[in-house]
């Protein structure tokens, strides 16, 4: 009988003759194989004597006689890759495109080839095997082209005999049947056997949120079907995994670190998992553990502890309802968790927990006190491990000493581990070997000192080898073994003394096979076995789990025989039990409480016709159901599934009232501040949290949108609160001292921390700066040595939410984490503006570091002074001082800053300012102040190209206020639409100091062109306005709206991120904007194309339920009425919310505008106290049901597809497509519910035009719109792509143009590639890719178009009495059959013009032909290039013009980008 070979990596220490084999009959036989490299990937083919391992990354060794002899596999070198689902199958990945596969345990191998190089990364496997069909596999490869390497996925269904392409640019593909247990107990095999899930990038421009799609036909029909949950496409895919029969998806969304877990058992229907009783599941902070066929085990990491600690959850049989079992399980920094089930026995597992978890989490303990516990009832209870009268603690997964399982094997009930007795787990080197033969109930010490160990012959043989370091080295010359379950041990000398290390300077390594088959000649008989109960209760009787008792037939400990049943694992004997409470789990809509009972989770609803009165009772669900797969017998046992009588008061909601509900709460405060904690797509729960601060520094929290309030208990007043910029569940409260508070559970609880020093207000901003991707990383800027208003501001950083602080920099003005975005790839990168010499009176300079300024500091611009910096999207924008001017620089990688080229003769004085208007389309909007006199500020808005290096003028005279806010507002969701107010009397303002006069402007093509707002035809009463109204706004008659600079709360906006196309504003119709007191309220339903007046006078407004409810209330005067509309403003209804008039200071709702609740913040009469009204529209019958949206029939039910108009663009195209949005039909009586993906994937792409291109890097726009190389700059070597990618075949000569990254246009004008040339030494590949044209073909290609054009041109000339004139863009004339626009004339004219062009181009043509003979120049064909995604993608293709005639330059138009938020530099 053969046990597993023991791997010893070491050097031969005792010199002797060539080692021989021990020959004693009472000792095992040992054979040694010497190697010169460490053997890796040792694999045993099940049910065979074949063992295979890899030496380094090259040679592969194989043994077919259980390691007695070894040989090297000939002509097959590479990486060994095993098929874990099919134990006879494996692959060898060759170093090129040649690979091998076996299906018969390495007896035979078949060669196969993949067109591209396989991916061998830490996170990407080369093969993804089918769970049941060994012939099916997904193959992950990468294809390297001119623009870089891209992922390509292939598949095979016939054992690698044929390989076909599946997809490209995916982020991972998986078989639906990715585990042998998928579909267990369900008749779905035929439906999902060929189904493949793939993670793809976002389907829309700049939507990087990964989505999950599937196909049952290998995507051959180009149909990628999105996975949807309740009609919503699943996005933000973070992880895809198989846990036994369960398919599990983890998703994350912007604005929260919480992950949503979705589970399916049939690869067709998905449900979100709920976690009860512990911390929320966070992105990257959870691990799926070894699970059973009826539940999933998950470890969720704690967010607070600097020493890793987790919480262990166990699911019900659906995999969707998780209950926390252990709140302090031990884990390491890589999320490996000390958890392991005892092999083959249901319900028993060992864990290590942190006994001082609270002290560790709060920073009071510097190390973890780890103790071991065991559960015999599937995690309901845990008990200590007992050795005699002592507790023992064992090292587990986080400190592995064995390969494979840590404690157990298929040997029934045999468990071993290294540990110690006492009150806590000590270091491994201080441990002993312990063994249990009753599945962990009792333990005995097996051997002193730490040992590696292994099980053999179904547990009748235990083997151990010394594994404890003496100094830094482990010496051993013997092994130990036991034949009676570890009661007695014998030692066997090894041929030599070995040093157990991973590396050795002598480079000698050994594999030893140890054969114990000669120790017992007899094979075990019937009387040598016992019927062993796998689980015992407290009385020592066999215990039940999952409705049955489990027994094994195993060899008695003292039997002098071997089982000798090779390749056969023991199977349990099952004995059913009567049902008890433990055989039931919580039914859907219920959860476990602390007493392990099932209670409603808030979703319990009575049946139709029940609960007509609040005091009624009804027969409802018990909350329990029998666990699927449980074998218990209900007869004579417990049955918890029967319905029970329940009180109607238990129901989550009463009947729809048809009325609007109002709750009023008074507060003794004059001033107030409030913050909503917004919800993200993956946020769990349904709270609507508002946090409110009084002028006395008191904090009140409401979880139900202001219906009820709880007062926070803080020892000192709160001065400010700061919601986390990137995590919507987190908020910080700041006091006047070093003390501050945070909440990571949406205000449910608050925890105190101390900063190094109090924050100061000298910066004009709050002290905390957050990391975009690491929610617990903070920068705190406080003041030291403060004297009056003068402070030396110092920055500190923390990586654990303020538990510990380290010095970052002194003398700073601002510091911020950059995060990963675009080409910014370093998580640790920090930028700071620091005063020279740390002196607050001196100029600032820009510095950066990716080592927290502890080792390396980069000083940018040679230490020259800067005015400020900011980061927005993927750009870092800096304003430097250059004499009396400011200059702008931009970086996309945090290393190289490119000077931003402003339009000619556009200079910015030092005293003036930049305001950066944030962008979401890879460009920068910049407001440059041109006149800075207080109260008379205005400037110009510039727009950059996609790398922020070149600007064009977008809007002159844009209004700015003294706080540097700008009247510029991006209309949310709708692409390309923005509003702005301009000062039209700029000369009078500058020269005569007159008051500013404003006009409102709108753009529909992303600030390329602006127009006045068209006024409504009539006012709300049907009367005309006092000016001549036309379809377009004119200088004498247009609509003008008060903008961003006049708002009391800069969080207010004219539009909503969820109410598509709806805009509300306050203003007037006339020649210019008048005083706010004279304003009326206007609305647009089509993103600003048309407007109508909705109320006389000025009103405040809020959008609710994504625009299906809009509420307005009078501004600045007492009222007791609000008005609302349910049909996008077509009709309005007044509602009296109070008996006495109040003045509404503000109206608010959740920032996403998805709630049906609103808050009115009011003052009553002459009092200064505050009254907050909650207005709840949930009871309206018109909003009783949820709207239905079907993606395959988007206009069939409650929605329709709406496309915004872009009147200044041809065919409404913008960014290369016509956008389509899902909008609720105004008359649909339903509510939207969770936030919809408004932009439809059914967008229509347009042909490329000049608007889809911009100037390439090192090129700049000329006055005629063309692009030319910047004077003094040289293009980079376009052959760099060949150097960067050895597989590249060709490169393109630069044209000066590149496609906008945001554009999705197809075909049409192609300006970004003209001439292709072969890479060095790739002449043959280039010719194969671009076969040349024959001489005859060239003659025909030239002669026939010329002849045809001449004939048709002569006919047109003879039939048309007009004369050819000069063609200008934009001219229009009356149409006739012989007009220039008539097809009868336009086509011949085009042909004749083409003839003239061909004749003109003949010299260029012959020149080009000559060059093609010499240099293989290729004219553009049908090949299409991907849009540039980053600066690096186009940097390698710079250069001056080649083969581009001058007339083509005028095709390039203005760049198109968008921006929204503002940040002053």
Swiss-Prot record:
According to the record, the signal peptide region is 1-23
Q: Where are the transmembrane segments?
A: 1337-1357, 1384-1404
- Primary subcellular site in the record, as a coarse category: Golgi
Residue stretches of each BNR repeat: 374-383, 434-444, 481-491, 700-709, 1082-1092, 1124-1133
What's the protein's topology in the membrane?
Answer: Multi-pass membrane protein
SUPFAM superfamilies in the record, alphabetically? Oligoxyloglucan reducing end-specific cellobiohydrolase (SSF110296)
Q: Which InterPro entries match?
A: Sortilin_C, Sortilin_N, VPS10, VPS10-sortilin, WD40/YVTN_repeat-like_dom_sf
One Gene Ontology CC term in the entry: Golgi apparatus
GO terms of biological process kind: Golgi to endosome transport; Golgi to vacuole transport; protein targeting to vacuole
Q: What is the annotated localization of this protein?
A: Golgi apparatus, trans-Golgi network membrane; Prevacuolar compartment membrane
Q: Which residues lie on this side of the membrane: Lumenal?
A: 24-1336, 1405-1465
Source superkingdom: Eukaryota
Protein keywords = Glycoprotein, Golgi apparatus, Membrane, Protein transport, Receptor, Repeat, Signal, Transmembrane, Transmembrane helix, Transport
Q: Please name the Pfam families in this protein's record.
A: Sortilin-Vps10 (PF15902), Sortilin_C (PF15901)
Question: Which residue intervals are topologically Cytoplasmic?
Answer: 1358-1383
Q: Which family does it belong to?
A: Belongs to the VPS10-related sortilin family.
Q: What does this protein do?
A: Functions as a sorting receptor in the Golgi compartment required for the intracellular sorting and delivery of soluble vacuolar proteins, like carboxypeptidase Y (CPY) and proteinase A. Executes multiple rounds of sorting by cycling between the late Golgi and a prevacuolar endosome-like compartment.
Q: What is this protein's name?
A: Vacuolar protein sorting/targeting protein 10
Q: Which organism is it from?
A: Arthroderma otae (strain ATCC MYA-4605 / CBS 113480) (Microsporum canis)
């Amino acid at each position: 009988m053969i046990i597993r070979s023991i791997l010893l990596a070491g050097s031969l220490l005792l010199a002797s003759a060539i080692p021989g084999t021990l020959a004693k009959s009472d000792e095992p036989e040992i054979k040694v194989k010497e190697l010169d490299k460490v053997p890796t990937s040792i694999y045993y083919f099940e049910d065979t004597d074949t063992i295979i391992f890899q030496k380094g990354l090259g040679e592969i060794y194989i043994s077919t006689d259980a390691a007695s002899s070894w040989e090297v596999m000939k002509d097959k070198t590479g990486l060994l890759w095993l098929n874990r689902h099919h134990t006879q199958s494996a692959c060898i990945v060759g170093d090129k495109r040649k690979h091998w596969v076996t299906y018969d345990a390495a007896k035979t191998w078949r060669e196969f080839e993949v067109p591209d190089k396989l991916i061998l990364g830490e996170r990407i496997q080369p093969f993804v095997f089918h769970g049941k069909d060994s012939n099916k596999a997904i193959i992950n490869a990468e294809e390297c082209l001119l623009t870089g390497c891209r992922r390509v996925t292939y598949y095979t269904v016939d054992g690698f005999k044929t390989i076909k392409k599946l997809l490209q640019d995916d982020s991972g593909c998986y078989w639906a049947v990715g585990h042998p247990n998928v579909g267990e107990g369900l008749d779905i095999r035929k439906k999902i056997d060929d189904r493949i899930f793939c993670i793809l990038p976002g389907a829309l421009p700049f939507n990087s949120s990964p989505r999950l799609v599937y196909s049952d036909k290998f995507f051959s029909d180009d149909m990628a079907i999105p996975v949807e949950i309740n009609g919503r496409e699943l996005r933000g895919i973070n992880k895809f995994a198989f846990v036994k029969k369960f398919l599990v998806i983890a998703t994350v969304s912007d604005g929260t670190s919480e992950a949503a877990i979705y589970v399916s058992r049939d690869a067709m229907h998905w449900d979100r998992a709920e976690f009860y009783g512990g911390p929320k599941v966070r992105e990257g902070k959870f691990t799926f553990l070894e699970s059973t066929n009826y539940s999933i085990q998950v470890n969720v990491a704690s967010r607070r502890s600097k020493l890793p600690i987790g919480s262990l959850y166990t699911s019900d049989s659906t995999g969707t309802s998780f209950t926390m079992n252990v709140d302090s399980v031990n884990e390491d920094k890589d999320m490996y968790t000390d958890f392991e089930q005892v092999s083959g026995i249901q319900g028993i597992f060992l864990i290590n927990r942190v006994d001082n978890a609270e002290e560790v989490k709060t920073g009071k303990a510097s190390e973890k006190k780890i103790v071991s516990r065991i559960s015999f009832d599937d995690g309901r209870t845990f008990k200590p491990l007992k050795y005699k009268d002592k507790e023992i603690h064992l090292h587990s997964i986080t400190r592995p000493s064995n390969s494979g399982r840590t404690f157990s094997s298929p040997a029934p009930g045999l468990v071993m581990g290294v540990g110690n007795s006492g009150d806590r787990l000590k270091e491994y080197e201080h441990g002993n070997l312990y063994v249990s033969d009753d599945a962990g109930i009792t333990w005995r010490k097996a051997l002193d000192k730490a040992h590696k160990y292994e099980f053999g012959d179904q547990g009748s043989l235990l083997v151990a080898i010394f594994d404890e370091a003496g100094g830094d080295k482990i010496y051993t010359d013997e092994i130990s073994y036991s034949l009676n379950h570890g009661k007695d041990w014998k030692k066997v000398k090894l041929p030599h003394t070995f040093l157990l290390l991973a590396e050795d300077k002598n480079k000698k390594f050994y594999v030893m096979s140890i054969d114990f088959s000669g120790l017992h000649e007899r094979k075990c008989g019937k009387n040598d076995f016992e019927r062993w109960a796998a689980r015992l209760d407290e009385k020592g009787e066999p215990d039940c789990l999952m409705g049955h008792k489990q027994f094994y037939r195993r060899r008695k400990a003292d039997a002098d025989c071997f089982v000798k049943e090779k390749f056969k694992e023991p199977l349990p004997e099952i004995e059913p039990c009567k049902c008890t409470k433990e055989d039931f789990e919580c039914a859907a809509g219920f959860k476990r409480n602390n007493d392990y009972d099932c209670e409603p989770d808030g979703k319990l609803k009575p049946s139709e016709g029940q609960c007509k009165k609040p005091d009624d009772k009804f027969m409802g669900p018990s909350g329990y159901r029998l666990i699927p797969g449980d074998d218990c017998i209900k007869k004579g046992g417990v049955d918890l599934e029967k319905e029970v009588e329940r009180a109607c008061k238990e129901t989550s909601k009463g009947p729809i009232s048809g009325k609007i509900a109002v709750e009023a709460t008074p507060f003794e405060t004059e001033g107030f501040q409030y913050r909503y904690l917004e919800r993200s797509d993956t946020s769990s729960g349904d709270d609507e949290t508002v946090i409110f601060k009084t002028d006395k520094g008191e904090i009140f929290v409401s979880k139900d949108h202001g219906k009820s309030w709880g007062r926070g208990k803080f020892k000192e007043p709160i001065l400010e609160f700061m919601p986390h910029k990137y995590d919507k569940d987190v908020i910080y409260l700041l006091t006047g001292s070093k003390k501050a508070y945070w909440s990571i559970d949406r205000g449910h609880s608050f925890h105190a921390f101390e900063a190094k020093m109090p924050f100061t207000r000298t910066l004009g901003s709050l002290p905390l700066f957050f990391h975009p991707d690491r929610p617990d990383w903070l920068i705190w800027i406080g003041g030291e040595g403060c004297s009056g208003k003068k402070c030396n501001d110092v920055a500190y950083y923390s990586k654990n939410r303020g538990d510990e602080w380290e010095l970052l920099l002194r003398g700073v003005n601002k510091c911020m984490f950059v995060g990963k975005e675009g080409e910014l790839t370093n998580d640790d990168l920090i930028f700071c503006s620091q005063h020279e010499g740390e002196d607050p009176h001196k100029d600032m300079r820009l510095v950066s570091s990716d080592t927290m300024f502890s080792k390396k500091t980069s000083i940018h611009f040679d230490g020259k002074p800067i005015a400020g910096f900011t980061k927005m999207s993927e750009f870092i924008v800096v304003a430097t001082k250059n004499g009396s001017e400011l200059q702008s620089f931009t970086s996309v990688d945090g290393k190289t800053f490119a000077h931003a080229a402003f339009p000619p003769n556009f200079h910015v004085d030092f005293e003036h300012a930049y305001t950066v208007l944030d962008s979401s389309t890879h460009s920068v909007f910049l407001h440059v102040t041109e006149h800075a006199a207080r109260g008379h500020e205005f400037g110009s808005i510039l727009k950059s190209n996609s790398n922020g290096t070149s600007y064009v003028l977008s809007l002159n005279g844009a209004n700015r206020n003294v706080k540097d806010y700008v009247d510029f507002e991006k209309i949310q969701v709708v692409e390309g639409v923005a509003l702005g107010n301009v000062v039209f009397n700029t000369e009078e303002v500058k020269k005569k100091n007159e008051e500013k006069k404003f006009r409102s402007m709108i753009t529909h093509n992303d600030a390329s062109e602006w127009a006045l707002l068209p006024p409504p035809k009539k006012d709300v009463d049907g009367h005309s306005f006092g000016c001549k109204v036309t379809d377009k706004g004119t200088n004498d008659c247009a609509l003008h709206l008060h903008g961003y600079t006049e708002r009391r709360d800069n969080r207010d906006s004219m539009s909503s991120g969820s109410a598509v196309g709806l805009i509300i504003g306050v203003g007037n119709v006339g020649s210019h904007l008048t005083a706010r007191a004279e304003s009326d309220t206007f609305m647009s339903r089509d993103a600003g194309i048309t407007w109508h007046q909705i109320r006389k006078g000025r009103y405040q407004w809020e959008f609710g339920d994504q625009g299906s409810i809009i509420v307005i209330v009078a501004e600045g005067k007492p009222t007791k009425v609000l008005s609302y509309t349910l049909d996008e403003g077509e009709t309005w209804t007044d509602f009296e919310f109070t008996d006495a008039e109040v003045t509404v200071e503000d109206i608010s709702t959740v920032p996403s505008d998805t709630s049906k609740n609103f808050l009115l913040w009011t003052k009553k009469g002459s009092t200064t106290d505050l009254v907050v009204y909650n207005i709840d529209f949930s009871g309206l019958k018109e909003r009783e049901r949820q709207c239905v949206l079907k993606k395959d029939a988007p206009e069939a039910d409650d929605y329709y597809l709406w496309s915004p108009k872009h009147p200044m663009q041809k065919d409404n195209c913008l960014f290369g497509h016509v956008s389509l949005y899902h909008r609720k039909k105004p008359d649909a009586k339903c509510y939207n519910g969770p936030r919809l993906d408004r932009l439809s994937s059914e967008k229509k792409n347009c042909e490329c035009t000049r608007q889809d291109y911009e100037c390439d890097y090192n090129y700049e726009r000329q006055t005629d719109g063309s692009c030319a190389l910047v004077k003094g700059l040289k293009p980079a070597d376009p052959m760099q792509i060949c150097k960067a990618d050895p597989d590249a075949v060709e490169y393109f000569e630069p044209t000066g143009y590149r496609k906008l990254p945001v554009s999705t246009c197809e075909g049409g004008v192609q300006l970004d590639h003209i001439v292709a040339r072969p890479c060095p030494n790739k002449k043959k590949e280039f010719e194969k890719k671009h076969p040349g044209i024959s001489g005859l073909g060239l003659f025909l290609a030239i002669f026939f178009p010329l002849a045809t054009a001449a004939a048709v041109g002569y006919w047109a000339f003879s039939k048309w009495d007009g004369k050819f004139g000069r063609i200008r863009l934009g001219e229009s004339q009356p149409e006739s059959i012989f007009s220039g626009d008539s097809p009868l004339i336009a086509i011949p004219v085009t042909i004749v013009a083409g003839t003239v062009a061909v004749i003109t181009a003949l010299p260029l043509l012959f020149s080009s032909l000559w060059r093609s003979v010499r240099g293989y120049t290729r004219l553009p064909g049908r090949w299409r290039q991907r849009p540039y995604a980053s600066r690096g993608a186009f940097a390698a293709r710079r250069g001056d013009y080649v083969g581009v005639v001058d007339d083509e330059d005028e095709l390039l138009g203005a760049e198109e980008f968008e921006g929204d938020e503002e940040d002053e530099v």
